[in-house]
Amino acid sequence: SLRKTVQDLLVQLQEAERQHQSERVDFEATLSRYQREAEQSHVALQRAEDRVEQKEAEVEELQKRLLGMETEHQALLAKVREGVTALEELRGKNSDCRAEQEKAANLEKEVAGLREKIHHLDDMLKSQQRKVRQMIEQLQNSKTVIQSKDTAIQELKEKIAYLEAENLEMHDRMEHLIEKQISHGNFS
């Protein structure tokens, strides 16, 4: 009778150990899958962060160029104003002197050239501003992607922690069950 009880207990113990082993294998597979996913997400996150840094540097560079172009634009406008003022003065004198007329004609040409330059600069400025706006938009999108990847990584880490805790609990339960059955077997 004692032998039968011991045999029954051993069979139960082996069954429990088999089940525990099978659960442990499942758990470890799930855990390593989650760890792999977390690692892949982390790598993707790093890449996205690098791209954001690069874009921020490009935006900064574009903004510097814009500032330079705006300064040039202001300088050209000032030159045009000077030219127009000089022309008006010449016209005001209403002199017939050929040298003055030549000077006025040259000034008019210069003013026309400057206006052309300003027009060209205006177009470039608008194009650069559009570019900067688009890049800032892309940056914001990238940052949103990074935040969602961050959240996904956090969720995976929480799942891993939960599974590890669950495994520990299962392990403790198994040990407790085995101890209980062994001590129970000794008394019967």
Swiss-Prot record:
Residues 1-181 form a coiled coil. One of its GO terms (cellular component) is extracellular region. It is found in: Secreted. Its main location: secreted. The keyword Amino-acid biosynthesis does not apply. It comes from the Eukaryota. SUPFAM superfamilies: Tropomyosin. Belongs to the tuftelin family. This is Tuftelin.
